[in-house]
From Swiss-Prot:
The keyword Transmembrane helix does not apply. This is Myocyte-specific enhancer factor 2C. Forms a complex with class II HDACs in undifferentiating cells. On myogenic differentiation, HDACs are released into the cytoplasm allowing MEF2s to interact with other proteins for activation. Interacts with EP300 in differentiating cells; the interaction acetylates MEF2C leading to increased DNA binding and activation. Interacts with HDAC7 and CARM1. Interacts with HDAC4, HDAC7 and HDAC9; the interaction with HDACs represses transcriptional activity. Interacts with LPIN1. Interacts with MYOCD. Interacts with AKAP13. The modification Phosphoserine is found at residues 59, 98, 104, 220, 226, 238, 386, 409, 435. The modification N6-acetyllysine is found at residues 4, 114, 117, 232, 237, 250, 262. Residues 58-86 bind DNA. Keywords: Acetylation, Activator, Cytoplasm, Developmental protein, Differentiation, DNA-binding, Isopeptide bond, Nucleus, Phosphoprotein, Transcription, Transcription regulation, Ubl conjugation. It is found in: Nucleus; Cytoplasm, Sarcoplasm. GO terms for cellular component: cytoplasm; nuclear speck; nucleus; protein-containing complex; sarcoplasm. There is a cross-link at residue 381 (Glycyl lysine isopeptide (Lys-Gly) (interchain with G-Cter in SUMO)).
Amino acid sequence: MGRKKIQITRIMDERNRQVTFTKRKFGLMKKAYELSVLCDCEIALIIFNSTNKLFQYASTDMDKVLLKYTEYNEPHESRTNSDIVEALNKKENKGCESPDPDSSYALTPRTEEKYKKINEEFDNMIKSHKIPAVPPPNFEMPVSIPVSSHNSLVYSNPVSSLGNPNFLPLAHPSLQRNSMSPGVTHRPPSAGNTGGLMGGDLTSGAGTSAGNGYGNPRNSPGLLVSPGNLNKNMQAKSPPPMNLGMNNRKPDLRVLIPPGSKNTMPSVSQRINNSQSAQSLATPVVSVATPTLPGQGMGGYPSAISTTYGTEYSLSSADLSSLSGFNTASALHLGSVTGWQQQHLHNMPPSALSQLGACTSTHLSQSSNLSLPSTQSLNIKSEPVSPPRDRTTTPSRYPQHTRHEAGRSPVDSLSSCSSSYDGSDREDHRNEFHSPIGLTRPSPDERESPSVKRMRLSEGWAT
């Protein structure tokens, strides 16, 4: 820190004035010496103080310098105090550096402009490297759903599987379907039955069991996992999909997994909202869990909920109308059904509702193309027909296929319309066909056998 700058005026205190004179006089002589040596010049300094004392300084000899001075005619430069003051004022007005060392920290216009430029460059860098708020998902989230308790669903998402997101974990062994035994004929799924939604083996090896799972609806929306013998590898970024339908539309299917408790099932209006909100992603929703009406449970059929539900399920035409067509927990939710169409489904009779289901499934099979990664082989095996006695031993495995004795119920009509084939193609392709949904039809004699229907009604669905 430099010395404090003092005002150049006469010092009133005698003592201070004497001290200042002594110091500055020596300083002046020192400067004269430096100037004479550095610049090779002759200097003569004559000082009279306030008490008329003489102080002189000469670089060589005072008499010699004074003689030279008297012989000189006209000085080249002659200055007085007024000239020095004027020169100092001009320097300050030009913005030259002040003797005060603190003035170097002053904010000059040039420095302020420099700081402004630095701030602008920093702001531009922040804007250009801004991180996006919602990065697009690039991986599948595996979900394992044990069914030991019907009050809650435990979703286990292992973090380590994010590095290799190609597996859908298998669910509880109670979800295994007894489709390996000869003779169990796959029935066509009804509005809430997903047992035949993907029956068969979708990989080169024979899978033993699979649980309900869901994949990312954006990357690999084409496959849904159902309780069948399948083992599916869903890849993070699928290769170009293989179109399996009539039109080359974008395959948009995703999985809707219902809550575990039957007391917390979403209402019909919530399901309508879910179906309509799914249209923003253009993804018709296909649920893969067993349906459960509020206050009612299903027994015997493997599902993501519990297999310990009671078997007091009974489905009437009024209950079917309350389902709003396909709006059950595992029904086929069509994203194209709007709110007013859902409202009309409430008021339609069962016969008209069954016709609507048949028309809607035909549209679904032709327009909503299920896409599979082209690296996977489609090999769906059909199984031999079982004797009718096997059907009576497990009546509750196909709960929504019960029929009234007078004729087929609307649920059966809905189940028959869930197939991707219509007309005689269903019967012709019963033994060997390659379908992305893997549906098989029962034989006509089994469908029309009243004894089998009565036994199922008496054993599995007695209230």
